Amino acid sequence: MLQTEMKVIQQTEIADKVYELILTGECVAGMSPGQFLMLKPSRSDLLMRRPISICSYDKTAKTCILLYRVEGDGTRDFSKLSEGDTIDVLGPLGKGFDIDTTPAPKTALLIGGGIGVPPMYQLGKELAEKGVQVMFVNGFQSAKDSFYAQEMAEYGTVHIATVDGSLGTQGFVTDITKNFPEEPDVIYSCGPKAMLQAVKASFPETKTYLSLEERMACGIGACYACVCPKADDTNKQFKVCEDGPVFRADEVKL
């Protein structure tokens, strides 16, 4: 983990209020799929850092891509960044996805919902490079919210569900996965809690890893703002930022 400044290479709005931010910096060397960065807004009245998941990285070029949706003052501040600007970053943080499971999977199902889609990209890329057959299932509210289908298609098959039916299957990600003829060897998922609950319930016998989305204040486990109950003892809790954000589905109570 480093507290450092990263330089903006490029920023583009790629969907409705969703931005692709390309950064460069030394901290890229320590990144792994499923981790996140804590970004500090430039405005002096915005004291808290914002957690942004890592979409992809290139360790040789020392660049990474973050995808985020503008939802408040902090992310609105980030959306004003342009080429050559710098941003104060803490990271990479958290425990990411386990891609070295034993036995090695032949098939992997990657399920993302909304702004939970970005971490699926680098994960799918690295799994595909290991020879795993990758299936992406992405869920969005509408076609205008959809992104990265073309990029993901380089590493696996892509299925899209939209609530309003404007793109792909009308409904939710589970309306797609319930029609798959065979269960995958492993499932990785990131998105809203309701979606993760549905994924967990749909595949009770499949090895499943869930990346939890929680509001975070410190990002390093000091403030207990992002706790999640343990499945085996509801009196004990995980700190999502430090113990996760990725957990086995059987570890957590959603």
Swiss-Prot record:
Residues 1-99 form the FAD-binding FR-type domain. Keywords: 2Fe-2S, Electron transport, FAD, Flavoprotein, Iron, Iron-sulfur, Metal-binding, Pyrimidine biosynthesis, Transport. Responsible for channeling the electrons from the oxidation of dihydroorotate from the FMN redox center in the PyrD type B subunit to the ultimate electron acceptor NAD(+). FAD binds at residues 50-53, 67-69, 74-75. HAMAP family: DHODB_Fe_S_bind. GO terms for biological process: 'de novo' UMP biosynthetic process. Its cofactor is [2Fe-2S] cluster; FAD. CDD domains: DHOD_e_trans. It comes from the Bacteria. [2Fe-2S] cluster binds at residues 218, 223, 226, 241. Heterotetramer of 2 PyrK and 2 PyrD type B subunits. Binds 1 [2Fe-2S] cluster per subunit. Binds 1 FAD per subunit. InterPro entries: Cyt_c3_hydrogenase_gsu, Dihydroorotate_DH_ele_sf, Dihydroorotate_DH_Fe-S-bd, Dihydroorotate_DHASE_ETsu, FAD-bd_FR_type, FNR_nucleotide-bd, OxRdtase_FAD/NAD-bd, PyrK_electron_transfer. Belongs to the PyrK family. Pathway: Pyrimidine metabolism; UMP biosynthesis via de novo pathway; orotate from (S)-dihydroorotate (NAD(+) route): step 1/1. One of its GO terms (molecular function) is 2 iron, 2 sulfur cluster binding. This is Dihydroorotate dehydrogenase B (NAD(+)), electron transfer subunit.
